[in-house]
C-alpha cells in the first residue's frame, strides 16, 4: 500500500472522529436555552392560578349575596343551557342505520328532536 494513501485515510478518519465529538450534544448545555422559557411558563401558570382563585372567590361571594329571585332563575338557566348543548351535539344516539333503497337511509331506534316540528320524530331521514 502507498504510505500517502494510508496517511490520508487515517487523517480523514481522525477528522471524522473529531467532528463527530464536536457535534455531540452535551446534556448540561442542551437545557440551558430552555430554562428562561420554563421559568416564564411557571410564572405565568402561577399567575393564572392566583387569578383563578380570585375569580372563584368572587363567584362564591356573588352566589352568597344572591337573592331569592336568583335562586328561582338558576334551574331555568341550567335547563336552557342543557337544551342548547343537546342541539349542538352531533346526532349520535342511534344504534344503527339501514339502507332501505338506493339513496334512502333510515335510522333504527332513533328518536331525534326536530326543532322545526316541535316534537320528536322517528328516525327516517
Swiss-Prot record:
Pfam families: ANP. Belongs to the natriuretic peptide family. Keywords: Cleavage on pair of basic residues, Disulfide bond, Hypotensive agent, Secreted, Signal, Toxin, Vasoactive. This is Natriuretic peptide GNP1. GO terms for molecular function: hormone activity; hormone receptor binding; toxin activity. It comes from Varanus varius (Lace monitor lizard). Expressed by the venom gland. Residues 23-78, 105-125 are annotated as: Disordered. Residues 1-25 form the signal peptide. It comes from the Eukaryota. GO terms for cellular component: cytoplasm; extracellular space. It is found in: Secreted. Disulfide bonds join 94-110. Its main location: secreted. GO terms for biological process: blood vessel diameter maintenance; cGMP biosynthetic process; cGMP-mediated signaling; negative regulation of systemic arterial blood pressure; neuropeptide signaling pathway; receptor guanylyl cyclase signaling pathway. InterPro entries: Natr_peptide, Natr_peptide_CS, Natriuretic_peptide, Natriuretic_peptide_brain. Residues 26-85 form a propeptide. Exhibits natriuretic and vasodepressor activity. Acts by stimulating cGMP.
Amino acid at each position: 500500500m502507498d504510505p500517502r494513501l494510508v496517511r490520508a485515510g487515517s487523517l480523514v478518519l481522525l477528522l471524522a472522529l473529531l467532528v463527530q465529538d464536536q457535534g455531540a450534544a452535551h446534556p448540561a448545555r442542551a437545557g440551558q436555552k430552555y430554562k428562561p422559557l420554563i421559568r416564564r411558563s411557571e410564572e405565568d401558570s402561577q399567575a393564572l392560578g392566583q387569578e383563578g382563585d380570585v375569580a372563584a372567590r368572587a363567584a362564591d361571594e356573588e352566589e352568597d349575596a344572591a337573592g331569592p329571585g336568583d335562586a328561582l332563575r338558576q334551574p331555568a338557566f341550567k335547563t336552557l343551557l342543557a337544551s342548547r348543548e343537546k342541539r349542538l351535539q352531533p346526532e349520535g344516539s342511534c344504534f344503527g342505520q339501514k339502507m332501505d333503497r338506493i339513496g334512502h337511509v333510515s335510522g333504527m331506534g332513533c328518536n331525534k328532536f326536530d326543532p322545526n316540528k316541535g316534537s320528536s320524530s322517528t328516525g327516517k331521514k
